[in-house]
Amino acid sequence: MSEKNTIQFNFSYYALNLLGKQMYTNRWSAISELVANGLDAGATNVKLYINSINKKKSILEIIDNGSGMSYNDLATKYALIGRNKRLSENELSDKIKGRKGIGKLATLFLSKKYYIVSKKAGVTTAWMLDSTDKNDNDVPELI
């Protein structure tokens, strides 16, 4: 075989939901993980807004002043499940609170649909993951 082909792994909604649900014992531990992600991004200010007046459509917003994510950051860092932030030379490895690179899955413990709004270098971008009507075998996409 003279030609070398590579195959990248994909994760189905089932796998991501399973990981998200199995990692946390309650919603507060999942929220704590998401706050830690902001702190890992250098945030010095993190605010939580919770609107649970309508229990079926509760809203949780976590707003921080961390470094933010560009489209490239989202594609190469956020979407990579299990990324070790400590190996990146551009990040403050001694202050990193995350341990396994899968804390972003805490969102799936909390909801089947979530939004990411981020600002980096003056550019605001937004993405959404919605697994509400997806089959277990579908591959997730942030849109």
Residue ranges and their predicted role:
Residues 1-143:
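GHKL (Bergerat-fold) ATPase N-terminal catalytic module, capturing the glycine-rich phosphate-binding loop
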